[in-house]
UniProtKB/Swiss-Prot annotation:
Class of the enzyme per the UniProt entry, highest EC level: transferase
Keywords: DNA damage, DNA repair, Metal-binding, Transferase, Ubl conjugation pathway, Zinc, Zinc-finger
Superkingdom of source: Eukaryota
Name of the protein in its database record: E3 SUMO-protein ligase gei-17
Knockout consequences: RNAi-mediated knockdown abolishes metaphase and spindle midzone-specific smo-1 conjugation during the first embryonic mitotic division. RNAi-mediated knockdown disrupts the anchoring of telomeres to the nuclear envelope in embryos, but not in muscle nuclei. RNAi-mediated knockdown results in ectopic tbx-2 expression in seam cells, the gut and in the syncytial hypodermis. RNAi-mediated knockdown results in 19% embryonic arrest with 2% having extra intestinal cells, which increases to 82% and 77%, respectively in pie-1 mutant background.
Species of the source: Caenorhabditis elegans
Amino acid sequence: MLPNNQWQIPINNGLTHQENMAAHAAVMKLRVHDLQSIISQLSLRKPRPQKSEHQKVVVESLRDPHHARQIYQMASNFPNGNYEMQKRPATTSQVRSHPYVLPSRSGASNHLVNHHYQQQQQQQPQPHNLLHQQMMASHHSHLQQQHHPSTVRWLTPELLEEQLRGSMRYGAPAAAAATNAPLHSSFPNHGRSSQQSLQKSEKSNRPKKMYADNFEPLPLPFYDVISVLLKPVELHSSDSPTLKQTKQLQFPFLLTAEHISKISYRADVTPLPRYELQLRFFNLTEPVQGPQKDDFPLNCYARVDDSVVQLPNVIPTNKTNAEPKRPSRPVNITSNMNRYKKEHTVAVEWLADKRVWAAGVYFVHRVNSDILFKRLNQNVSRHRSLEVTKQEVIKKLSGGEDDIAMDRLNISLLDPLCKTRMTTPSRCQDCTHLQCFDLLSYLMMNEKKPTWQCPVCSSNCPYDRLIVDDYFLDMLAKVDKNTTEVELKEDGSYDVIKEEAFCISDDDDDDVVPATVNGTASCSSTNGNGLANEAAKKKPADDDIITLSDDDDEELNRGIMNSLNDSFSPGRHTASAELAAQKTPPQQKKKTKDDDIEIITLDDTPPRPVAASANLPMRQMSQQNQMPVGSSPSGMASTQMGMNEGASKTIRDALNKIGEQSANSSTQSSPLVQLHHTTHPLNFAQSSYMNPSSGSQTPTSQYGYSPMINQAPHFQMQNGLIGRNNQMVHMQQHHLQQQQQQQQSPQIMSPSFYAQQQMSNGGAFAYYPPQYPQQQYRQN
């Protein structure tokens, strides 16, 4: 598109300079369909659908001498959008026979006049109609003398009434008497309805104001208004008070070169602060005292230079038939406009009802929370002095005018928004509480979602009403960094409140260790005299500490497993016995004079005979698995507890000698145990946990056999002899050997308690103390 100043250069297109300027101005005023008709008639190149592209094609064609004259004539003949229109030649079908055939903007008014005229023709005689024809002829001649013959004006109701009265003055003398009568007297049947229709038509055709009444928009802290590009224009209400209508309006505005240079950036990557173009809507239905906040019309839709503006999303609601509402915030239209163009247009479409709205465009400078924080913190007038707040504290705690005094007033030093320690305590001037909040946190929260509500009392807390309290600012500088709460006094001073926190340990120490916060022990009380600490130190440890431990049992089991592998190693018996003797069952700790803690070991497992079990041969270990009928594991455990170390050593020596004698008369490596073949009143039975059908077991098992036994031996009983295969030993010889052992060392248990037992899994023998009844069973 060529600007106007370039048409001052002489162009050789066959038109004068004035004609070129007139043609250019006429083209710029044409509508899109008029431009399209010129392009189609002259067969010009087809432009893009934008109006600016159509204008560009037509203006460029003015340089062509073949099209310049035609474009000038066609553009000049098109209407320019004003209230004047070109008069077309009337045809015979358009000639009216009554005197009220004047064009009107409203088709309803013409129809109403025609209707009244038809009824008048039916009631009045024909000569009266001739009189009206004469009046019509004289009226047309009078209009042709006053107005330009090529145009007529659109009539308003006032002009229509004036012309009707004038037509009567130019008529017959009989009609002159009607000039003093009211207008509706000519229509006796429908005079009232005609007057009401004219009043409605006058009201609907009355020109409406473009700009809204003066009001004060709500100032936005994060937007500094530089200039007003479009003064708030009025979005009119619906013509019918009960019906809603969809309306559209377009408003032009201009940008200067300075504005264009400041917004020539990419809005998505440019950080704050930056310049923006802002579109705002307001509700002007009811007069509101104070600034007007942003409010969007119903079903609002906006476009800037044919680009759709993204409005804030509708707030979701669960209420039925609720009117959709949008958040109260401005709209950034910087990215919706051509930044290198001066003339712009805003088009707004909305659903009009009885409410009145307004829309305006502003050029603003957008800032962030850090800039607002510096502005308020550096402004001395926005700081409340220490003495003013101190007097307010004294007034609240002493009762003041209300005679209601508080016992104490605790103030938290933590920000109610972030739950962290405040750095710049601030509050609203209109709030009555003394509790403050952090200024920077409050500004950052409202930058993301502008609500401007006090975090303490939820009342309105705008930016221009915020203050910085120097009383609490001085308090934060003096108290410890770990302090989170203070108590205000009646004289305006304060005490630091520190919480008592102690850690209860499960150790045997009597000392109470205070809990630490960030490496510093907090053990002071509310009054600072330290009474709580002294009481905590003098508090005796009366609680019983119970220790549940299985470490000793694990060591015993480990010793037993080692003894199974070394049961026939004579050199290791002594070392195993010494090791097992050192590992005694856990005993109760002795109480000292300073120790009042009683240690209880909740271990219902009976202690085991460590020394005996650690050095018994494999077959003697298997003998312990035999239990008499009617016995229980608990009885077995108590019997083992009764065995002392001397008895265990005697039994071990006796069994070793029997094994050596059996080994001398046999080539087998496993010993044979000799027993009396006599009937004993005590019979033995197999333990329930011994499987008679099981074969040879691994040496690592508690009930296993020595590695020297490769196969399970088979025992036989013949004539008082017991042995494996043909290796038989007299029972009498075994009895003599047992008597010799009794004479050498004190014997607690008689060898007669070793009963004969034939087992299919290797011929193992079991030993039981004399207090248990023994029963002997022969296995099948």
